[in-house]
Amino acid sequence: MIPRVAVLAAGYWVEGLALFGFAWLIGVVVLLYLFAYVVHRPHEQTGRYLDTSTILLPGLPGRLLTRLWLFQNYHSIHHLFPRVPFYRYSRLYTEIAEIMAAKGSPVYRVTPRGLQPLSAESAA
């Protein structure tokens, strides 16, 4: 907060507002995209198992991104079991993946071609 005030107090208020306002706007857009839009795809159906998705991120980079994303790639678990802490989503998903597949829950895997639907046979 101090550097922002210093920039504004030094007479660079237009530049400071533009810089910090732009950074704020980018932050809001990224947060909305990652925490509201992506996790609720495909946005076409409603129902307990259908209105949010699970996005599987493979490998070590996937485990790191899952933690950075605060396990929101398992957002469907949050909707199914809101009292489960976010850091337990992946373990719970592993336990109920077959049930979710049987109920038609959307599960995607990140690939070089983007998000690809995961077949019911390979969901677990």
Language-model-detected regions and their locations in the chain:
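A structural signal for well-ordered alpha-helical segments within the folded catalytic domains
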Residues: 28, 71, 87-90
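Hydrophobic transmembrane alpha-helical segments that form the core helix bundle
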Residues: 1-66
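Non-catalytic, topology-defining segments of multipass membrane proteins
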Residues: 1-22, 83-124
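Alpha-helical membrane-embedding segments
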Residues: 52-65, 78-92
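Residues that form generic nucleotide/phosphate-binding pockets
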Residues: 37, 67, 95, 99
